[in-house]
C-alpha cells in the first residue's frame, strides 16, 4: 500500500572519499567566488541525499561529505583571500591545464585566524605545497587535519561509521616565511593558523 512507499529509504546515498573531495572543491569554489556567491546552503542534511545518515531506532553517522561542510561552516567565515596556485596539472574531456591542487583561504580578523582548505586531486602523486605568507602576521599552526584513505570508494556506514574521518596531522610546517607540506594523493587538508 501507500504506507510502504513512505517506509522505503529513498535517495539515501552512500558517499565515499571521492564525494568528499568533490564537496570540498565545490566549497572552495564558493569561497573563492564569495564576492559573487553571498550564501550557499546544503538543502538535505539527514537521510535524503545526506550529510548525516540514520536508521530507525539506531545510530546516526556522518557521511564523508559532512566533513568539508563542517570545516567550511566553522572556519570559512571572514574574508576570502585570492590564492595564486601553481601545481602540477592534468587535462580532461572538458578542460585543459587543470591544477591538481584546489584551495581556498579565509582570514578572520575577529578570531585572528587564517584557514586553508586544500584538496589534492591527483590519483597518483603527492603534491608539494608551498604558500608564501610573508605579508601575513602568522603566530603558529593551531590545527591541521587530513581526510584520505587507501580506498577511494571507502565510505562511512552503519557498521563502519568512522571509515572516512578527519585525522590530526602535522604535515604542514613553516620554513622561513612559507607554509609547506607534502599533500598525499586524493586528500583533503584543513589548516588553521593563528595570526596577530
Give the predicted meaning of each segment.
Residues 176-196:
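Beta-strand-rich recognition/accessory modules
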Residues 1-6:
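Short, small-residue-biased leader/transition segments that mark boundaries at the very start
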Residues 97-138, 144, 149, 186-192:
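Carbohydrate-binding surface patches
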Residues 27-44, 49-95, 190:
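Catalytic cores of secreted or luminal carbohydrate-active enzymes
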Residues 19-27:
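Short, hydrophobic/amphipathic alpha-helical packing segments
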Residues 137-183:
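Acidic, Ser/Thr/Pro-rich beta/coil linker or hinge segments at domain junctions
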Residues 26-30, 39, 91-92, 101-106, ...:
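Generic recognition of flexible, low-complexity loop/linker segments
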Amino acid at each position: 500500500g501507500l504506507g510502504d512507499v513512505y517506509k522505503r529509504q529513498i535517495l539515501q546515498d552512500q558517499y565515499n572519499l571521492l564525494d568528499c573531495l568533490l564537496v570540498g572543491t565545490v566549497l572552495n569554489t564558493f569561497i573563492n567566488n564569495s564576492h559573487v556567491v553571498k550564501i550557499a546552503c546544503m538543502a538535505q542534511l539527514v537521510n535524503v541525499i545526506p550529510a548525516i545518515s540514520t536508521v530507525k531506532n539506531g545510530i546516526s553517522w556522518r557521511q564523508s561529505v559532512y566533513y568539508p561542510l563542517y570545516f567550511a561552516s566553522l572556519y570559512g567565515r571572514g574574508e576570502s583571500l585570492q590564492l595564486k596556485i601553481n601545481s602540477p596539472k592534468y587535462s580532461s574531456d572538458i578542460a585543459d591545464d587543470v591544477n591538481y591542487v584546489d584551495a581556498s583561504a579565509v582570514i578572520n580578523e575577529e578570531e585572528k585566524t587564517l584557514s586553508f582548505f586544500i584538496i589534492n586531486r591527483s590519483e597518483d602523486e603527492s603534491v608539494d605545497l608551498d604558500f608564501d605568507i610573508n605579508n601575513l602576521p602568522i603566530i603558529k599552526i593551531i590545527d591541521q587535519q587530513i581526510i584520505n584513505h587507501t580506498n577511494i570508494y571507502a565510505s562511512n556506514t552503519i557498521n563502519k561509521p568512522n571509515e572516512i574521518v578527519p585525522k590530526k596531522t602535522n604535515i604542514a610546517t613553516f620554513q622561513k616565511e612559507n607554509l609547506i607540506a607534502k599533500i598525499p594523493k586524493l586528500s583533503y587538508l584543513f589548516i588553521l593558523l593563528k595570526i596577530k
